[in-house]
Regions:
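GST superfamily/GST-like fold recognition
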Residues: 17, 21, 42-56
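Glycine/small-residue-rich phosphate/adenosyl-binding loop
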Residues: 1-26
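A short mixed-secondary-structure module that forms the rim of ligand-binding clefts
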Residues: 27-33
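C-terminal helix-cap and adjacent tail motif
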Residues: 66, 70-98
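Short low-complexity, flexible loop/linker segments enriched in glycine and/or proline
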Residues: 60-63
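Short hydrophobic alpha-helices that are characteristic scaffold elements of the AMP-binding
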Residues: 35-39
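Short coil/turn connectors at secondary-structure junctions
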Residues: 1-3, 42, 66-70
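Acidic, glycine-rich active-site loops and adjacent beta-strand->loop/helix elements
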Residues: 11-12, 50-54, 80
Length: 98
């Protein structure tokens, strides 16, 4: 990847925004970065991997231990080749309605 972005969830105390919404918003950031990169013709991927949970990595990124979390690493670059399509589940077998 030509670029790797680290996305952190850094919740703060706020009278109107619950911590859970702050955490969810960092996931939305990751998803929007993927969408934007792909719309511009780049290949992109969102991974966490072991280093997202590593204290040294958190320290390196300036995160607050036990407060901030790495939501993921966004890899952006150019495709060398088209990825092969993986088998997908049949929606009717995994979705149920009430």
């Amino acid at each position: 990847a030509s670029v790797v972005l680290a996305v952190l969830s850094t919740p703060v105390e706020h009278p109107k925004i619950p911590e859970w919404e702050m955490i969810l918003s960092s996931g939305a950031v990751c998803m929007n970065l993927l969408s934007c990169a792909q719309s511009l013709g780049y290949a992109s991927q969102w991974l966490t991997e072991w280093y997202a949970y590593n204290d040294k990595m958190l320290e390196y990124l300036g995160a607050r231990k036990n407060l901030d979390k790495i939501s993921g690493f966004i890899y952006i670059g150019h495709k060398i080749e088209e990825p092969t399509e993986r088998r997908r589940p049949v929606p009717e077998k995994i979705i149920s309605y009430l």
